[in-house]
Design a protein with these regions (language model features):
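Non-catalytic helical/linker scaffolds that mediate oligomerization, partner binding
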Residues: 1-295
Length: 295
């Protein structure tokens, strides 16, 4: 078993995490705010002698700026086209709102959620008419330029749906090694057709769970991905309960056991469980023991 760990850029426990026997790399979530340049943070994280995977957001829809519903506009990271009215989902699919109209990169909401919508939040619109304009964001391109200067090559790309998505990354970073994050039905279709031809796959369950629309279908989706690429990475909601309590809930244990049973041996721990030293180390220790039991 090997595990990629999401790293808070300024955590003081990264050396300890890097030395854990099952850690195979660091993931930098590029929505995290920085107090230094992109080049400087990449240089600093590289000093821990672990590969650094830079997670580019690509066509993933995210909120730009803050908005206070109801009856407000939400500015997105990309212009879109979609038939309206249409549902949009926030908070990993737990909050559904009605979009009355779309104007380029603006959603005009007809109702909630009745809270502040903050910058960086992901937005899911699950509709066959959805078209997202553009792929790489300006931040993505800035990171790729810094990686090229530093000779770094490892990239994760969100919402991959075609070979063109990977080709765009390689146009900025020709020798890049890309992990393809599969998060939509179109992405699943691409994975079934091409497997690992364009790079290893990642079952990014956070958005994938919302995008398959009917919750139970996510189980079949993660099976599809590991069948398409026996070395695929599984990510999102791995042992998240450890972020709130010292002992994981039974469902989390069963989840990891299921993933091991269907063939996953590469895991990625997400932001939630990696924010604190105790929780990330407990998650790593537990995965190590469960991995041994699965051998």
């Amino acid at each position: 078993m090997n595990v990629i760990v999401t790293v808070p850029p300024y955590a003081d426990f990264l050396a300890e995490v890097a030395s854990h026997p099952i850690v195979s790399g660091f993931r930098l979530n590029t929505v995290m705010p920085l107090r230094e340049s992109h080049r400087e943070v990449l240089q600093r994280l590289s000093k821990f002698n672990q590969p650094v995977w830079v997670d580019l957001k690509g066509r993933q829809l995210r909120v730009v700026g803050a908005a206070i519903p109801p009856y407000t506009e939400v500015k997105l990271s990309h212009p879109i086209k979609v038939e309206t009215p249409v549902d949009a989902f926030f908070s990993d699919g737990n909050e559904r709102v009605k979009v009355a109209a779309v104007d380029g990169d603006r959603l005009i909401l007809a109702d909630g959620p009745r809270r502040l919508i903050g910058p960086g939040e992901s937005v899911n619109i699950v509709h066959p008419s959805l078209k997202i304009e553009g792929t790489l964001t300006d931040t993505d391109k800035t990171y790729l330029a810094a990686m090229k200067e530093l000779g770094m090559t490892k990239v994760m790309l969100s919402y991959v749906e075609s070979a063109d998505d990977v080709d765009e990354v390689k146009s900025y970073l020709p020798n890049s090694e890309v992990i393809l994050k599969i998060e939509t039905q179109r992405g699943l279709d691409f994975a079934k057709k091409h497997g690992s031809k364009h790079g290893h796959l990642m079952a990014a369950r956070g958005d994938l769970y919302v995008e398959v629309l009917r919750p139970h279908k996510v189980a079949g989706a993660v099976k599809t991905i590991i069948k398409a690429d026996k070395d695929a990475v599984i990510a999102s909601h791995i042992l998240d309960s450890l972020a709130y309590q010292p002992v994981p809930v039974s469902a989390d244990i069963g989840d990891v056991a299921f993933l091991l049973e269907i063939g996953y041996r590469a895991f990625m721990l997400g932001d939630q469980v990696c924010l604190r030293r105790d929780t990330v180390l407990e998650a790593l220790n537990l995965l190590e023991e469960m991995g041994k039991s699965a051998e």
